[in-house]
Curated annotation (Swiss-Prot):
It comes from Staphylococcus epidermidis (strain ATCC 35984 / DSM 28319 / BCRC 17069 / CCUG 31568 / BM 3577 / RP62A). GO terms for molecular function: ATP binding; damaged DNA binding; DNA helicase activity; hydrolase activity. HAMAP family: TRCF (MF_00969). Its EC number is 3.6.4.-. Residues 809-970 form the Helicase C-terminal domain. Keywords: ATP-binding, Cytoplasm, DNA damage, DNA repair, DNA-binding, Helicase, Hydrolase, Nucleotide-binding. This is Transcription-repair-coupling factor.
Length: 1169
């Protein structure tokens, strides 16, 4: 498709006339619709293959035109310089996504790459790093190259990288021994191993496992920020800032001069101690002697295209006023300096005076720029058919008769075949082989997608998309923006940090104080140091670390510490044990009951089912497909289904449920879709109607929005079997509703129903298939204990065209709020404004109304009557309001695809899981969502709040919540699954221990023998310094991770693997680590030989075998193998256990390793037959 439309256009006279002057002189091109314009621009780029700059008035327009251009130009050649709005960018902590796109763009330009660069106005005017300085900081490292390590590390800091002990996020680097790890903004994390100052090897590595993979010969390291800050820049900044401070001070009110002094001092302090790019970017106008703008990065022969010039001029005017107001507010309040700015004040067109510019506008209008040519195109919109086949047939026939070339773009290969056969049935000839020459009067159906179709009458060309045929939305063309791996979303909530609460299986809740190396006797070992009540401390040898878990409970709860040696912990554990046993009994009864009961067994999928599923306009995610298969498998079995489908907000649970409902209807069964609120009922009802409009399925709704007459008719229809699917609130559970043949009950968010309703659902479950949907994740640990009791399906992958919500953490400021509101409303979107104080919520609305006089603003809170609240929400969904000022009542369940900006005041007061769920309200369509978490300006955040906001910022990836925020939700989910009263028990022993106890109880009741996950304990006591010294591994977390791995080693292969990892991550290891590995090696062989104890007696080593191993060993073989040890080895038997003594010599450790290996090899292998 890329070449076909473009080729067709390139041969047209009108395009050739345009091509001659395009990029040579100032021209105006008018009359083209957005997708036709994208087509012409893309064709010009493909033909000339030079750098091309395309300026739009805002990021929304840039995104829109980019989507269409990507249909023609390969995504490796399309670049965007995404800037939201200048002030928010400079004053907030931002997600790395946009930053990496900006860095990619600047780097490509600085290296003279060809490409089509799309830039919104505020990105075009922004002050940037001088081009030469940027070029100096492009680094390519090659194997064999000699580097000055200090200068190299210094350069990384200039480029915006942060030094950490372990690299886990974009923009970090670490140095351990001779190993440098770097996670660049573009590309994969790399590990550089040095031999003195020479680059010995470069490998990419995985941040999740910290292991390196393939060797590479060279790596390009891009900057981690769009500003480069060197020592010279800091020097220049200090001088300029001092001048600005001295100039500003006398010009402002005396009352705020102290504030100005504080602002100045804080910046000065910041520069001298540790400069943070996020903070210093506010001072960009003082940083460089001659800052650049984006146009300075382009080559002289670049082609410049401006989209809708007059609209850009309007935006520029607003932008200039906004920045000036913003800065004067800062200056007047003592928070800013005269001369502090972010962009070039020269007008936009003045920046382009040196270049020939092609201006594209839809209508011809007067423009204040010199023009040499005006080229007018005639372009018509395409008829919207929306599935009306008669109109479609007559229009297509008209095109064919008039010798038009018609190109129909559809999104998948299967749809190509379906549309072709549909058109062939209308007797319209179609072609699918787009490589042959296309004649007029033909219809080509091919894969592709544009935002809309267009008709160019002069060229006799019509392009029609699915949107015109069937009203489906364009699928977003994904660009290769780097998605952040799960590892980065925050390693795991199990990471132990000093000060964390822990649970020791035998001693209870304590506090983790770190790893300490202690000298006991003459040997050094590592111990985990724990603090208990009062001054009690416990040192746990690292090889017993599996008895210590991180304490995880409901959000932000601090537990009481236990007393060492007290009875309190024993009592607590006994109570919890009783409770999990009761639950286990309940679960087992339920399990037996389900196995015994018989329900309806559905048949295999029908042809209608396949047609219905093909109709879905999006690709299913792998998790959705798996869930659908699991549900259909349940339905096709005789026992009733009871499955829980859990997936993050907006991950496509509804589509899975809709397919199950359709399957039930095709087998002549009725379906009840039960939801907690009237609004959700309305939304699900509309979804079902839209999805099933082409199939003979009768769908009805029972809710307060229906008249008594409609509800009466629905009830009759359910009783007679006329109604196939009914959607409704708890009214569906009423005694007055009778079904002719109910086959499937779908329950959305069961935990939100009352006790009475839950009981009614329980009775229905006995002989009807039940599918329950929930957005609260169910913890993995519970999946295991629930296996076979309640079936679970999990959707963890987001749909293809969902974008991460761009998350900003900002100080509260009216300018930011106004800007965010204006940006969303300018793209015809809506805003959730979260204000959690009911008593002053109406004042907040008035305040916002003064900021945005033209906006329609509504209020929603929990003290309104249910009817008022529902009507307000419905009006908001129907876009009667632009802004909804609301409390946390929106946390669950409402889907407003058009609301894509969320602003939360005092975000520092919210819990992590709450912020995560609230943020899931936006970014639900294919538009990018924005979330602004505001905290009061002069308030010092407490540590927890700061960590929380930091975490939110880091999980800007979709669904990344399955990590840290999910900790709290997991516990909530566990409570929902097991009953609210379990919350207290979970909190008393911590979530992990609770899950473990539950799993053991369930398995015991089901008669399943627990396979020990860890190796049986072999006591090895040797007088050796065997530990991980702090000089070798600085990070305590990394230390604990390695000790955990060593504890699980059961084979030589696994041991080699850990050795490789140590060398890979921390370089060659010292003697203490070698001794530690020797002990693990001895344990591995001892484990397979049935050895129970290896003990250092001073002059000899004692080895005791288990009675079973004593029976199994082949004594003759052992003596034969151990001959080299001579008299150093003695063997005896005591209490049915073999006792081997090894006299110590100089090389006693090697002798011991040899001996244990011999014992293992002497075990008699039983014949299999």
């Amino acid at each position: 498709m890329k070449s076909m439309i473009a080729n067709y256009i390139s041969e047209d006279n009108r395009f050739q006339e345009l091509d001659e002057v395009f990029g040579q002189e100032n021209i105006l091109v008018t009359g083209l619709s957005p997708s036709a314009k994208a087509t012409i621009i893309a064709e010009k780029y493909l033909k000339d293959h030079k750098q091309m700059l395309l300026v739009t008035n805002n990021l929304y327009q840039a995104d829109k035109i980019e989507t269409d251009i990507l249909q023609y130009v390969d995504d490796s050649e399309v670049y965007k310089y995404p800037v939201q709005d200048i002030m928010t960018e400079e004053f907030s902590t931002q997600s790395p996504q946009l930053m990496s796109e900006r860095v990619r763009t600047l780097t490509a330009l600085a290296q003279g790459e060809k490409g089509l660069f799309i830039v919104p106005l505020n990105g075009f005017k922004k002050w940037l790093t001088p081009v030469d300085l940027w070029k100096d900081h492009q680094m390519t490292l090659k194997v064999g190259q000699d580097i000055d390590v200090d200068a190299f590390l210094n350069k990384l800091v200039n480029m915006g990288y942060r030094r950490e002990s372990v690299v886990s996020h974009i923009g970090e680097f670490s140095l351990r021994g001779g190993i440098i790890d770097i996670y660049p903004l573009i590309g994969t994390p790399v590990r550089i191993e040095l031999f003195d100052t020479e680059v010995d090897s470069i490998r990419d590595f995985d941040v999740e496992t910290q292991r390196s993979n393939d060797n590479i010969n060279q790596v390009e390291i891009t900057t981690a920020s769009d500003y480069i800050i060197t020592d010279e820049v800091i020097q220049h900044l200090q001088n300029e800032l001092k001048k600005a401070y001295e100039y500003t001070r006398p010009k402002i009110e005396k009352s705020v001069r102290n504030d100005l002094k504080e602002t100045y001092e804080s910046f000065k302090l910041f520069e001298s101690t540790f400069f943070d790019h996020q903070l210093l970017r506010r001072l960009v106008s003082f940083m460089y002697e001659k800052p650049s703008t984006l146009i300075d990065y382009f080559q002289k022969n670049a082609i410049i295209v401006v989209d809708e010039f007059n609209r850009i001029k309007e935006t520029e005017e607003t932008l200039t006023t906004e920045v000036e107001d913003f800065m004067s507010n800062l200056i007047e309040s003592g928070n800013g300096f005269i001369g502090q700015g972010f962009m070039k004040y020269e007008s936009f067109d003045a920046l382009l005076e040196q270049h020939a510019v092609a201006y594209f506008t839809l209508f011809t209008s007067s423009m204040q720029v010199p023009l040499q040519h005006i080229i007018k195109f005639s372009c018509k919109p395409v008829q919207q058919f929306y599935g009306q086949y008669d109109i479609m047939r007559s229009e297509f026939q008209r095109y064919v008769h008039q010798d038009y070339t018609v190109v129909v773009l559809v999104e998948t290969e299967t749809k190509v075949e379906r549309i072709q056969s549909m058109l062939n049935e209308m007797h319209i000839p179609t072609v699918s082989n787009i490589h042959e020459d296309i004649d007029g009067g033909q219809v080509v159906v091919t894969e592709g997608s544009l935002s809309e179709g267009f008709e160019l009458p002069y060229m006799q060309l019509v392009v029609i998309t699915e949107r015109e045929l069937f009203k489906t939305r364009q699928k977003k063309q994904r660009k290769r923006t780097k998605t952040i791996s799960n590892a980065e979303k925050i390693k795991s909530y199990q990471d132990l940090n000093v000060g964390d609460y822990i649970v020791h299986v035998h001693h209870g809740v304590g506090r983790y104080l770190g790893v300490e190396t202690l000298e006991v006797g003459d040997t050094h070992r590592d111990y985990i140091k724990l603090q208990y009540k009062g001054t009690d401390q416990l040192f746990v040898p690292v090889d017993q670390m599996d008895q210590v878990q991180k304490y995880v409970a409901s959000e932000d709860k601090s537990p009481r510490l236990n007393k060492l040696g007290g009875t309190e912990w024993k009592k607590t554990k006994a109570k919890v044990q009783q409770s999990v046993e009761d639950i286990a009994d309940e679960l087992i009864d339920l399990y037996k009951e389900r196995e015994m009961s018989v329900g309806y067994q559905y048949g295999q999928d029908t042809a209608e089912q396949s047609a219905f599923e093909h109709d879905f306009p999006y690709e299913l995610t792998p998790d959705q497909s798996k869930s659908i298969d699991e549900i259909k498998g349940d339905m096709e079995r005789a026992r009733p289904m009871d499955r829980l489908l859990c997936g993050d907000v907006g991950y496509g649970k509804t589509e899975v449920a809709v397919r199950a409902a359709f399957k039930a209807v095709m087998d002549g069964k009725q379906v009840a879709f039960l939801v907690p609120t009237t609004i959700l009922a309305q939304q699900h009802y509309e979804t079902l109607l839209e999805r099933m409009q082409d199939f003979p399925v009768e769908i009805q709704l029972v809710s307060r929005f229906r008249t008594a007459k409609e509800i009466r008719e629905t009830k009759e229809g359910l009783k007679s079997g006329y109604v196939d699917i009914v959607v409704g609130t708890h009214k569906l559970l009423g005694k007055d509703i009778q079904y002719k043949d109910l086959g499937l009950l779908i329950v959305d968010e069961e935990q939100r129903f009352g006790v009475r309703h839950k009981e009614r659902i329980k009775t229905l479950k006995k002989n009807v298939d039940v599918l329950t949907l929930t957005a609260t994740p169910i913890p993995r640990t519970l999946h295991m204990s629930m296996l076979g009791v309640r079936d679970l399906s999990v959707i963890e992958t987001p749909p293809e065209n969902r974008f991460p919500v761009q998350t900003y953490v900002l100080e509260q400021n009216t300018n930011f709020i106004k800007e965010a509101l204006e940006r969303e409303l300018s793209r015809d979107g809506q805003v959730f404004y979260l204000y959690n104080k009911v008593q002053s919520i109406y004042e907040k609305r008035e305040q916002l109304q003064r900021l945005m006089p033209d906006a329609n603003i509504a209020v929603a809170h929990g003290q309104m009557t249910e009817r008022d609240l529902e009507e307000t929400m419905l009006s908001f969904i129907n876009h009667e309001y632009d802004i909804l000022v609301t409390t946390t009542i929106i946390e669950t369940g409402v889907d407003v695809p058009n609301a894509n900006t969320l602003i939360i005041e005092e975000a520092d007061r919210f819990g992590l899981s709450q912020l995560y769920q609230l943020r899931g309200r936006v970014g639900r369509s294919s538009r990018i969502g924005y979330a602004y978490f505001l905290h009061p300006a002069n308030k010092v955040l407490n540590e927890t709040a700061e960590e929380r906001l930091q975490a939110i910022k880091e999980f800007t990836e979709l669904g990344s919540g399955f990590k840290i925020a999910m900790r709290d939700l997991n516990i909530r989910g566990a409570g929902n699954l097991l009953g609210k009263q379990q919350h207290g028990f979970i909190d008393s022993v911590g979530f992990d221990l609770y899950s473990q106890m539950l799993e053991e109880a369930v398995n015991e009741k089901r008669g399943i023998k627990e396979e020990s996950p860890d190796a049986p304990d072999i006591e090895v006591e040797l007088h050796l310094d065997a530990y991980l010294p702090a000089e070798y591994i600085q990070s305590e977390q990394a230390k604990i991770e390695i000790y955990k791995k060593l504890r699980k080693v059961e084979t030589e292969e696994q041991l080699f693997d850990v050795k490789d990892e140590l060398i890979d991550r921390f370089n060659d290891y010292p003697i203490e680590v070698e001794r530690l590995l020797d002990i693990v090696e001895i344990k591995v062989h001892a484990l397979h030989a049935g050895v129970e104890l290896i003990k250092d007696k001073g002059k000899s080593i004692q080895i005791i075998l288990s009675p079973k191993a004593t029976e199994d060993i082949n004594g003759e073989e052992l003596f034969k193998q151990t001959q080299p040890l001579g008299r150093a080895m003695k063997v005896g038997v005591q209490n049915n256990a073999m006792n081997v003594t090894l006299t110590k010599s100089k090389q006693w450790l090697d002798s011991l390793k040899f001996l244990v290996r011999c014992i293992e090899e002497s075990m008699a292998i039983k014949d299999e037959d």
